[in-house]
């Protein structure tokens, strides 16, 4: 049984809550007892909140974006390594039909994007560090 604490119950927080629901594998709990903290809060709060929970030696699952810059995202992943905990970032759009993704073990390459106005470099910056 994994003990989880959800912070933020807006649009995506509600989706996460409903998706996990009454899972027999997950126990909703107070933050001090949690194995995992799930952050579904406004983007500009992510860096500070993730830093705080990593410092408490909690595993963190953060809705995208992890931070507002590449540098701060890298700092968070390095800090998670230092603290010996896990840090994951959700990007639900990665799995949509809009993208054909090729996994070359070391990097992802988008081919034939249907939506031309997306900044793909920024999308890579915050959630593909685990490949390094």
What are these model-derived regions, one by one?
Residues 68-118, 128:
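A contiguous active-site-proximal alpha/beta segment in oxidoreductase catalytic domains
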Residues 6, 44, 110:
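Nucleotide-activated donor-dependent transferases that construct or modify glycoconjugates
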Residues 16, 26, 30-79:
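Beta-loop-alpha module in the N-terminal Rossmann-like domain of NAD(P)-dependent dehydrogenases
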Residues 1-32:
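N-terminal Rossmann-like dinucleotide-binding module
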Residues 1, 20-23, 55, 82-84, ...:
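Short, well-ordered coil/turn elements that cap or connect secondary structure elements
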Residues 123-132:
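Contiguous beta-strand/loop segments that form the cofactor/metal-binding neighborhood of enzyme cores
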């Amino acid at each position: 049984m994994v003990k989880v604490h959800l912070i933020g119950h807006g649009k995506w927080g509600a989706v996460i809550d409903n998706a996990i629901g009454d899972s027999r594998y997950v126990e909703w709990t107070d933050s001090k007892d949690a194995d995992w903290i799930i952050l579904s809060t406004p983007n500009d709060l992510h860096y500070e909140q993730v830093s705080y929970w990593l410092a408490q030696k909690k595993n963190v699952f953060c809705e995208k974006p992890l931070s507002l810059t590449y540098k701060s995202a890298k700092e968070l992943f390095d800090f998670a390594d230092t603290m010996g905990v896990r840090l994951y970032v959700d990007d639900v759009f990665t799995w949509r039909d809009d993208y054909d993704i090729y996994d070359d073990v070391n990097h992802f390459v988008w081919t034939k994007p249907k939506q031309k106005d997306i900044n793909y470099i920024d999308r890579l910056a915050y959630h593909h560090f685990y490949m390094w």
